[in-house]
UniProtKB/Swiss-Prot annotation:
The keyword Nucleus belongs to this UniProt entry's keyword annotation: yes
Name of this protein: Heterogeneous nuclear rnp K-like protein 2
PANTHER family: KH DOMAIN CONTAINING RNA BINDING PROTEIN
Subunit structure comment from the entry: Binds RNA.
Function: RNA-binding protein involved in the correct localization of transcripts in the cell. RNA localization is a widespread mechanism for achieving localized protein synthesis. Required for the asymmetric localization to the daughter cell nucleus of the ASH1 transcript, coding for a specific repressor of transcription. Overexpression inhibits translation of the ASH1 transcript. Involved in the stability of transcripts, like the MTL1 mRNA. Involved in structural and functional organization of telomeric chromatin and regulates silencing at the HMR locus.
Extent of Basic and acidic residues compositional bias: 369-381
Disordered: annotated segments: 1-34, 344-381
Lineage, highest ranks first: Eukaryota, Fungi, Dikarya, Ascomycota, Saccharomycotina
Gene name per UniProt: HEK2
Reported modifications of this chain: Phosphorylated by the plasma membrane-Anchored casein kinase YCK1. Phosphorylation at its C-terminus reduces its RNA-binding capacity.
GO molecular function terms noted in the UniProt entry: RNA binding
Length: 381
């Protein structure tokens, strides 16, 4: 029996949205409105692989479409620069988990919409075969047997979510249990690419379904990624849009054509610099357009109190910017902890003074009591 695509049922989330998330964000989710964002949600940064045409559609005339999505969902959203000879671009969307999921639901809805004045071009675009095979859909197009309302067939869309390989196994689950649960619960189709994106440790998770259903499944995927504590933040390389199809082995992020800087960060501050779920370091890499590798610690490592950060890029100014921002983050964290330590010491000092005063008062009371007894005896005599 064929699986039916299902309309999304909004997750019950409090609506005290002080982040500026708008209910308009859910208007795109045909087949069910996405949930409304809240300030209690942790943050995440999702990256999507786009073709050039998809990127142009999301940007819109003079950036109007992407600006609307950004404002409606209170997220940071951007698309990598268009490079001559490159067939793909990367969309990054950062913010709290629910707002990011809502924004991506809006993106799916934008990609689903066809220009009624140019139906032939839209049909050709849907059937386009890309030379860069990661842009070609892994999942087959939805059939009429997989949907209850044929009028909603065109509302089913896709996203190509870029995910670090270390998270893929958690999303799939033991014997595929987790991914099967997501598919059945949200009425979507999900598949992971077998191949790694060029020169990276990332793969594609393709999701097919209604925009609202994709929104809700992304919330659960985000929670899986954020709770995936057994991740080695390490040497995983992020994918950046290729210039040409690789003819051999993936190129190393530290080739001779790249500018390279190594920094030693105290082990005590590494977790804070990387951020929860590697969000902080990922945002830094995206903003500076660099590759940053955090080396794993070896048992025989002599510098056991430090971790090596390696920054590489083809552009020296980008490497310098990343180095400057990384050191600034380190100094901010050091200062933050020093301030906390001083406040803690001051509070302990105040507590000591109070204790000493209390002890002194008790001593004086004890000293005065015998004196009173002595005076009473003299009066009686």
């Amino acid at each position: 029996m064929s699986q039916f695509f299902e309309a999304a049922t909004p997750v019950a989330i409090p609506t005290n949205n002080t982040n500026g998330g708008s209910s308009d964000a859910g208007s795109a989710a045909t087949g069910g409105a996405p949930v409304v964002g809240t300030t209690a949600q942790p943050t995440i940064n999702h990256r999507l692989l786009l073709s050039l045409k998809e990127a142009a559609k999301i940007i819109g005339t003079k950036g109007s479409t992407i600006s609307r999505i950004r404002a409606a969902n209170s997220v940071k959203i951007g698309i990598s620069e268009k490079v001559p000879g490159c067939s793909d671009r990367i969309l990054s969307c950062a913010g709290n988990v629910i707002n990011v999921a809502n924004a991506i639901g809006d993106i799916v809805d934008v990609l689903n919409k066809r220009n009624p004045e140019n139906e032939d071009a839209a049909e050709g675009e849907a059937e386009e075969h890309y030379y860069f095979h990661f842009l070609n859909h892994i999942l087959p197009a939805p059939s009429k047997d997989e949907i209850r309302d044929l009028q909603q067939l065109e509302d089913i869309g896709y996203v190509r979510l870029i995910v670090a390989n270390s998270h893929i196994s958690s999303i799939i689950g033991k014997a595929g249990a987790t991914i099967k649960s997501l598919i059945n619960k949200h009425g979507v189709k999900i598949v992971a690419s077998k191949d790694f994106l060029p020169a990276s440790d990332e793969r594609i998770i393709e999701i097919q379904g209604f925009p609202g259903s994709i929104t809700n499944v992304l919330i659960e995927i985000s929670e899986i990624i954020l709770s995936d504590v057994d991740v080695r933040f390490s040497t995983e390389r992020s994918y950046f849009p290729h210039l040409k199809k690789s003819s051999g082995e993936p190129t190393s992020p530290s080739t001779s054509s790249n500018t390279r800087i190594e920094l030693k960060i105290p082990e005590l501050y590494v977790g804070a610099i990387i951020g929860r779920g590697m969000n902080r370091i990922k945002n830094l890499k995206t903003f500076t357009k660099t590759n940053i590798v955090v080396e794993r610690k070896d048992d025989d490592d002599k510098d056991e109190n430090f971790r090596k950060f390696i920054i590489t890029s083809k552009f020296p100014k980008n490497v310098k910017l990343a180095e400057s921002m990384l050191l600034k983050n380190l100094n901010t964290e050091i200062e933050k902890r020093e301030n906390y330590k001083r406040k803690l010491e001051a509070a302990e000092g105040d507590a000591t003074v109070v204790t000493e005063r209390s002890d002194s008062a008790s001593f004086l009371e004890e000293k005065e009591e015998p004196q009173k007894n002595h005076d009473n005896k003299e009066e009686q005599s």
